[in-house]
Amino acid sequence: MLENNVKYEYTKTPLDYQITEYDCGTTTLLNALRYLFKRSEISPKVYKYILQYTLDKSNIFGEVRKGGTSVFALEFLCDWLNENAKSKEMNVKCTSIPKDDISINNKFLSDKIKNGAVAIVKLYQDCDHYCLLTKLDEEYAYLFDPYYLNINYYDNDKDIEIIKDKPFEYNRKVAKVRMDSKSKKDFSIVTNKDAVIIVIEKL
């Protein structure tokens, strides 16, 4: 029998997928922590707080939690992390990009991502949807989309590729021109009053 010499890194966990139609915000914020921190570094109190304050919206029919997570809730949680995470033994900083400056080509965003930070980005995908930005190059953005899809879902879209072999990093490769297209196409950045990009970095 051949000896298995592969060494695995068990200190972090793979990024995760949402388990309902509504928890993309919850899952993406937790994925930011999964990406940045070792499992042993993530405070259970922070985890519980995120679960408690996301999924705060009702839908147009008044059904509680079925409106997903509001921008207000995400910004509230990020402010709370800035104030309290250190006391919970997690050194993390969250920064919201001003709405007028929201773009995949924002220099502050690019610099932070290149230095190991991540960002929660609100995108269009049939409806408003949160994904985690983890990497950028000249032409493409690399994101983890918490909504699980078949590998061939975007075969007819030249701007989007589904990636299946980077579970700790990303699962979508998206052309930056698509993200800044100000359209209703998948992965176009939301630019209305609910637009949001929140940069999250480990200090």
List the predicted regions and their residue ranges.
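Active-site-adjacent structural segments surrounding the nucleophilic cysteine of cysteine proteases
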Residues: M1-T69
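Generic short alpha-helical segment signal, independent of protein family or function
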Residues: F37, D79-K86, T191-V199
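General structural signal for secondary-structure boundaries
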Residues: E41-K48, K66-A73, D100, I104-N105, ...
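Papain-like cysteine protease catalytic cores
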Residues: I50-K99, I104
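Alpha-helix N-cap/loop-to-helix boundary motif
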Residues: G62-T69, D101, Q125, T191-D194, ...
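Active-site-adjacent substructure of cysteine-protease-like catalytic cores
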Residues: K93-Y148, N152
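Noncatalytic regulatory segments and standalone regulatory/sensor domains
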Residues: I113-K114, L136-L203
